[in-house]
Every structure is written in C-alpha cells, then in structure tokens.
Amino acid sequence: MTQYNTAMLPNGLRIIHRPSASPVVYCGYAVNAGTRDELSGEEGMAHFVEHMTFKGTEKRKALQILNCLERVGGDLNAFTGKEDTVYHAAILHEHTARAVDLLTDIVFNSTYPQADIDKEVEVICDEIDSYKDSPAEFIFDEFESMMYAGQPLGRDILGSAERLRQYTTADACRFARAHYQPDNAAFYVYGDVPFNQIVRTLNKLLPAATCGESVQNSAPTVSFAPPAERVVDKGTHQAHVLVGGPAYAGTAPRRFALIILNNMLGGPGMNSRLNLALREKAGLVYSVDSYLNTYPDTGFWNVYFGCDTHDVKRCRRLLERELCRFIDKPLTAAQLAAAKKQLCGQVGISTDASEGHALALGKTFAHYGLHRDIERIVSAINAVTADEVQRVAAEVYAPDRLTTLIYL
C-alpha cells in the first residue's frame, strides 16, 4: 500500500507527504480560496490576488521571488480554480528548504503593492481577451455559468476588466486576511525528503506568518438552473458544442458508477463509444470528449465536440443515441469487466505523472481531508455493478436533464 504521512500544526495548517525516489520534489500550498468564495463586488478577486502574490512580500521584491527557484533550475507557478488557489514548485530535493520558505513567504506575507496593480490588471485583461478568442476553451466557462446561473460557481474565474480596474491593495489584503490563513490551507509534498524535516520547517516559518483569523468556508447551497439550450453566433469556422447536465458531488457513493460511464462514453481511450460513433464510423469530428466536473457539494458532466456547422444535428443525434444505449441496455459482464480494467489501468498510469499527482494530492487533501489512495479507488471501481451503472445512466443521462451550448 502507498505510504502517506499527514500532520496538523497548532495553527491549523494540514500537511500531507508522499515519499518518492525521484530527485525532484513537488510541493505547494492549496488554499481554500477560489471564485466561489468571492463576495458580491469581488468578482475575479481570487485570481487577481493570485497574480499579485508574486509582486512582493515583506522581505522579498518581485524579482527576488522570480529568481529564487529559477536560479537553481526550479519552477514556481500558481493557478486559481472555482474553489481553491494553488501555489506550487518543482525543485531538486537538495533545494526543498528554499522552496518551502519561498512558498510560505508569498502565500502568507504578500504585500500586494499598489504600484504594481495597474500593470498586473492589464496583464489579466490581456488574459481575458486571449481566452475569449479561444472558443474551444471559453465555451466551458459559459456552460458552467448556465449550470449554476446567478451563483458564485457560475462566475468567470478571471472576472471583468471593469471590476478589476477598481481593485486596490486594501481589497487584496482584505481578501487575503479572510482566506490566506494556515487553517484554511494544506501544504503538500511529493518527493524524497524526510517528513519530519518538512514539519519542523513549517513550524518554524509559520507563527510569524499568521496574521488573522480565516473565514470558515460555508459555501451557500448550490442549485442547478433548469435545462436550457443556447446557440451563440461566434463567427467561427466550425461549430463548438457542449451537451451535459447535473451529476454528483465528489463524495457521492454513486460517483464511481458515473466515472465508469464517463470513461466508456468519451474518456481518453480511442475505443470510447463516442469516438467510435462520431469519428471512426461517421468521420464527423476530429475529437470528442466527455468530462466530469466535481466539487465537494455538487458536480456536472458534459460532452464536447467540434464539427462542421451543417453536421451539428447529426452529431447530436449520435450522442443522444449513445446516451440512450446506456439507459436502455445494461452492460454485459464482459463489457463491465473490460471497462473496469481499462479505467483501473488509466488510474494507475496517471500516478506516474509526478507533478499532476502532486497537485491532485494537495487539492484532494485540502478539500476532502483525504489522500488519493489508488488501492481504495480501484477497489471502489471494482465494486460497481452493471445494475448500478444502468440506474446512474438513467438518472444522469436522462434527455429532459440535458443543457446544450452551441457556438456557430
């Protein structure tokens, strides 16, 4: 069984460590502060604070932050999601202490200097424009805004240029004081470094970094908007289509049956039902993929494909046919066994992607207090029955629950 080490510091910071024989250490902070934690009038604030976190601390200027790991061949980066912001580093194990010190400093001691705000806001505005110019990416955000209309989960992570240009140092500090506290974060380490050394280092660094009381994250109850269909004229060369609907939260027992369904429907394998139907047999699309998007309290699924505009109706009919196949006809024992074997193999291989596994380690521990135990996941997958798969398909893939977004 895979070894994991966990601890909690007196200030509430949770730590998780997985040993590795690799000379590279992946580590970082997963802070429970994302788009859904923004108040009204704070749209885009979580992502704005992420950008400004690299602009200076009480003891480091921006250039010192950028050079700290780079000059020893390391990497420092961050990203913002709907429910978290993750600051992560990759470094040779002999430089682990340097990475831990830097990450702790920028997460808990950033000053968000006003002199850099105007410049960085324009960088984010360019990011917004670039994103809007990529319909195959932007469509996913608009689809989620349809699923969670009028709720924080439905907001765009990047915010709007108009709102961003109003933000000040005081706004960033207020958001950070509320959310960037040890008891609202988890520190993760994946690599060849002694666990007790990490705990000692963080115990030494963090008391001075703690500067307030974090807000207890109590996200409002989430509800799904009614099923809808929206067609948007984007003037693109091909149509971009998303079809999906409500699914399960990240802790729901039925999620494993849905994971099997999703993988069979449009997972990464070239033998997925949609790839065989839309690409291999009909030649209508270059790629078609099915996704599960889960949060601790909600979740949804969708299928994306791009095709010629005159093929949209035909592709949708083929998609609906495949959904109905899962609803109307139970999997045979051989089909279910093959699906489980393929999925378990993919799960196992995914752990070999070290940085991705490290990020998943941090995010899962931050939100669920659990580690991504491969043996436990495989056991849960193998326990799923054909009857359970069919019942989940009937609930999740029901035609009257589908929301559709089309860019033409």
Residue ranges and their predicted role:
Residues 1-25:
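N- or domain-start disorder-to-order transition segments that initiate the globular core
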Residues 3, 8, 64-214, 220, ...:
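Charge-rich, well-structured scaffold segments of protease-associated domains
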Residues 15-17, 29, 187, 243, ...:
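Generic preference for hydrophobic
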Residues 19-21, 28-30, 214-271:
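His/Glu-based metal-binding/catalytic segments typifying zinc-dependent metallopeptidases
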Residues 21, 28-90, 268-284:
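M16/MPP (pitrilysin/insulinase) zinc-metallopeptidase core fold and M16-derived inactive scaffolds
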Residues 22-24, 82, 182, 236-240, ...:
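Short, solvent-exposed loop/turn segments at the edges of secondary structure
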